[in-house]
């Protein structure tokens, strides 16, 4: 199994959450791959810049050296995101655009999204785990 960490999970890892760090360690010991979306990178980076947090930014940059960032450089991801967005809107259960892009990336890359955000459960075909509940 390979994973795509959502923004809330990366944030908890940066805050040294023991459950998240333990699960990351277990996954690494099983040689499972862990990725970060460029959307997550953007969300966390903008947050640290907005509050002028150089130490946290440095910790985040180190974290990003450990786990590859997946970029939105594939039109198929954007097409899948558009389909997910339309489907959720038609069902009357929209979610944030950032979450749609993360979900589309995970579906096309065959990754499990790790998140503490229950909104992602609305996305059909998305594999989702909440490492805070395991």
Residue ranges and their predicted role:
Residues 1, 103, 107-134:
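Acidic, PIN/NYN-like endoribonuclease modules and their adjacent C-terminal/linker elements
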Residues 70-114:
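Active-site neighborhoods of divalent-metal-dependent phosphate/nucleic-acid chemistry enzymes
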Residues 6-7, 44, 81, 106, ...:
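Generic structural signal for small/hydrophobic residues in well-ordered secondary structure
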């Amino acid at each position: 199994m390979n994973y795509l960490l959502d923004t809330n999970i990366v944030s908890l890892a940066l805050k040294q959450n023991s459950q998240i760090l333990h699960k990351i360690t277990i996954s690494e010991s099983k040689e499972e791959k862990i990725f970060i979306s460029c959307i997550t990178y953007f969300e966390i980076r903008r947050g640290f810049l907005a509050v002028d947090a150089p130490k946290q930014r440095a910790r985040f940059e180190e974290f990003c050296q450990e786990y590859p960032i997946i970029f939105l450089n594939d039109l198929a991801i954007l097409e899948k995101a558009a389909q997910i967005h339309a489907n959720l809107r038609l069902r009357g259960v929209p979610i944030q655009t950032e979450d749609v892009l993360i979900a589309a990336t995970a579906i096309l890359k065959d990754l499990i999204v790790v998140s503490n955000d229950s909104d992602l459960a609305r996305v059909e075909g998305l594999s989702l785990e909440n490492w805070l509940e395991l």
